[in-house]
Amino acid sequence: TVCPTGALMDMTSEARGLAAMFTETHSTCNYCSWGCTVKLETKKGEVIRIEGDENYNIGINEGNLCAKGRFGHGIIHNEQRIENPLMNVGGDFQEVSWEEALRTIADRMQTTLNRSGPESLAAIGSEKLTNEENFLLQKLFRDVLGSNEVNNLANIRAPYLNRFMLDCFDNGISSQPITKLQEADVVLVFNSDLPSEYPVGGNSVRFGTVFNNTDILIANPRRVVFESEAKIDVRLTYKHGSDVAVASRLSKIIIDNGLIDVNKAKSSIDNYDELVQSLSSYTAENTEKLTRLPDDVLPRAAESFA
């Protein structure tokens, strides 16, 4: 139930019965890379219900799930789901066994390896896989096949962001748990439709606006809907493709106006002086031409964020 009085019930599942008839499995939702912990209820090998896992005090979703994570399990047993590998035979895809498919892939990889060497093989992981699955993928290519050509879809989509994270935090992940969003004074949502792409993260930010007076800064080429316009402190709707100009202008304003501890910044950022010099071209006039943003909103965003 989602209602303390039981007036609102989840009626999406056709299966009914005593609790003893169901098997519970604790796992991680794989709809996106957020990593919500879930509890699956199954009956005779079929997923009947998925709920947020609150029993073990682990995970970042605190029992919350988005609509896809909670109600999207119907695809698992959908009659149109492809359950076995399909191999292109003469232009037509024919169903084959897993053993045949894996053997074909292994043989072709070995042939390529023998002919052109390990660097001719490459792997692309996914942010929708678990950390363990991505780890095994890179282990296969680096240790077994000898290839270092390993990448991830998340890095392909946002290589500069990942490089920035590596430079700042020595790894490609955030330095704080996602739940800290609801405790922040200011949250800058940059080029992300957080409520739609990562609803549980959007909930954390909304929680902060209600209970912690968190200010939200939205920077996005699209007009992201965030429940209520009143909750957004500053909105930066810039020209598509000018992300770097927006970030650079914000950085320049923060530095020029003395809104940061320069000594701390120099100790944390290699080549700090070169960074400052690289921002010199991002004047108010040039940035407005690149982003189509009036310069009066950028100082407000910079001051709020800093």
What are these regions (language model features)?
Residues 11, 40, 74-77, 258:
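Short amphipathic alpha-helical interaction/hinge segments
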